[in-house]
Amino acid sequence: MSKEKFERTKPHVNVGTIGHVDHGKTTLTAAITKIMSEARGGEFKDYADIDNAPEERERGITISTAHVEYESEARHYAHVDCPGHADYIKNMITGAAQMDGAIIVIAATDGPMAQTREHILLSKQVGVPYIVVYMNKADMVDDEELVELVELEIRELLDEYDFPGDDTPIIFGSALKALEGDMSDIGMSSIIKLVKALDTYIPTPKRDTDKSFLMPIEDVFSISGRGTVVTGRIEAGIVYVGDELEIVGIKDTQTTTCTGVEMFRKLLDSGEAGDNVGVLLRGTKREEVERGQVLAKPGSIKPHSKFEAEVYILSKDEGGRHTPFFNNYRPQFYFRTTDVTGACQLPDGVEMVMPGDNVKMQVELLSPIAMEDGLRFAIREGGRTVGAGVVSKVTD
């Protein structure tokens, strides 16, 4: 059988497994790839391949993550699984694997545990929009009432963190049985049901080109006789020659017009998400624009300096700080293309933050940055990364 060409016709969705240690995340990931590859072609990854996940670096932090892919009738899925609990936290905070939805794996034998709770809270904080539940190890429970209790507990826990507990699909099965080829309800068919739940419950994400135009400014030049050119990689949306744009962040917001788009020394009518371009601006002086600002569709993004964040602080072994920090710690916050100094307020009852900890904090920047909930940043001291974070809520 010849290999099928990877088709771009199906919408692409990013998912991942989360949940307490030893509840079966990696076994489930292996089972999905096995059953979907048998049904639709694709590559089966066994448990060992996934568990020996390669280390990656994201914003200066080393994270072990396994990436697998599979297809359903309707979609192409990219799925991440992390071997260690710390890897999950780093992964979710750095956005190394941005998820359109998460599969939370909960052992029916234990019910929700400490890390289950922590992962649901983090999903909320970092903006994972949808959760589907796989209640695993069904072959080890024969008490129907116990299963109902666990299900109730899961729905209440989801409600507690503002996920719709009553509407969340909960699939009951055994990832191990499915992997072994068991044909019963809790075996292979539970995996088919799970993938169907992903197809129907997680909406197709908006493509980057459908979002409002946004380009972080990396560099500014002036070209005599033509005006000012700003360069950068377009993060979202499309810009057309003739568009009115805003320059947002650091200083007061200014309005300008795009009079040209250039890529690889060629003039274009437009630039879109993913392109590295130079944008020629009319009526904007070279000294009015700087790296760290963004070029955006008017009204689509505002500058802010106060926010609540979920942060991971690197351990000493990861090249982070060797000592804890205290309230009013003032590092640099690196947003998109630039560093801005900010002051940190720790939560009540938290005296200090140790290297290797994750913490929720309030931050006030010295100058405003174009920002919205979900924006990622690095925390740096003198150019060295000491932490990573995500804006969970803009507060000004």
UniProtKB/Swiss-Prot annotation:
Coiled coil: none annotated. Mg(2+) binds at T26. The keyword Heme does not apply. It is an enzyme of class 3 (hydrolase). InterPro entries: EF-Tu_GTP-bd, EF-Tu_GTPase, EFTu-like_2, EFTU_2, G_TR_CS, P-loop_NTPase, Small_GTP-bd, T_Tr_GTP-bd_dom. One of its GO terms (cellular component) is cytoplasm. Residues 19-26 are annotated as: G1. Residues 60-64 are annotated as: G2. Residues 81-84 are annotated as: G3. CDD domains: EF_Tu, EFTU_II, EFTU_III. Residues 10-206 form the tr-type G domain. Gene3D superfamilies: P-loop containing nucleotide triphosphate hydrolases (3.40.50.300), Translation factors (2.40.30.10). GTP binds at residues 19-26, 81-85, 136-139. GO terms for molecular function: GTP binding; GTPase activity; guanosine tetraphosphate binding; translation elongation factor activity. Keywords: Cytoplasm, Elongation factor, GTP-binding, Hydrolase, Magnesium, Metal-binding, Nucleotide-binding, Protein biosynthesis. Residues 136-139 are annotated as: G4. Its EC number is 3.6.5.3. It catalyses: GTP + H2O = GDP + phosphate + H(+). Its main location: cytoplasm. It is found in: Cytoplasm. Residues 174-176 are annotated as: G5. GTP hydrolase that promotes the GTP-dependent binding of aminoacyl-tRNA to the A-site of ribosomes during protein biosynthesis. Belongs to the TRAFAC class translation factor GTPase superfamily. Classic translation factor GTPase family. EF-Tu/EF-1A subfamily. NCBIfam families: EF-Tu, PRK00049.1, PRK12735.1, PRK12736.1, small_GTP. Monomer. This is Elongation factor Tu 1. It comes from Ruthia magnifica subsp. Calyptogena magnifica.
